[in-house]
Amino acid sequence: MMNTLLEKGDEVICVVPGYQQFVDIPKSIGCKVRLIELDEYDWQVGVKKFRKMMNTSTKMIILNNPSNPTGTEYSIDFLNELIEVCKPYGTYILCDEVYRGLNQEVSISDIYENGISTSSLSKVFSLAGLRFGWIKANEYVIHQINIRRDYSMISTGPLVDKLGWIALKHKDELILRAKNIISTNKNIVREWLKENPRFECVLPSGGTVCFLKYYFDLKSEIFAKLLLAEKGVFFVPGSCFDKEYYFRLGLAQDSKPFKSGLDELSNFVDEHLIS
């Protein structure tokens, strides 16, 4: 999508912390990437920050809704305000909606002519191995994508098509399964946080990940490697998102190993970080 619509010299606005490719791909094309930081206390952002950055060179705003790694979910009011900011410039809003369906129901492509929605079976459907996804946008954008596709993947394989069709046919059951797992694990996190005051987390209303903050003087990559080596528990370190003293916590696994992993994190802290 970015390689199709963006050109060297275009300006792109990205929200951070966020998915690395949203920043690095435009940079590789030669775009000027401007960053807007989410507020740490609630992982939200106001439209005013976007308005200040907009100009005639702003080709695209890139969002993840809900966000990876924070779980941020943008409201319909926020999206409508952002659309009004973008309209005078014809700016695209590219929104990765890979977690859509758990809670967030508004798709940017349904409410904005230059809105582009991308999604896949990787997250909510737990079928990342299929590498199956889709794009929804206006006719011009889809036509440009089809032209580029002729020089890359051409089409998906018939087996992937079939398995994807089966998954989508049973989407209600699969989404309900995901909702139940995540709801249970969020409750586990809430109880765990009560017993571990040196950690805090804004639990998301949507999505399958959250950003766990810790209050120890230990860089996140070192912390993650030590924890993995000693306890066999892995978190994505916040340094991967240019945000130290955080871990990305995935909420979508079976509850028993999920709780066990948090308990091992507590044990590691008790053994090494609390004197």
Regions flagged by a language model, labelled:
Residues 14, 35, 62, 93-95, ...:
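Hydrophobic residues in well-ordered beta-strands that form the structural core
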Residues 116-183, 187-192, 263:
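Conserved core segment of the aminotransferase class I/II
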Residues 165, 181-190, 201-214, 245:
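Conserved glycine-rich beta-strand-loop-beta hairpin in the small C-terminal domain of fold type I
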Residues 10, 31, 88-92, 113:
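A short helix->loop->beta-strand "cap" motif at the edges of active sites that frequently abuts
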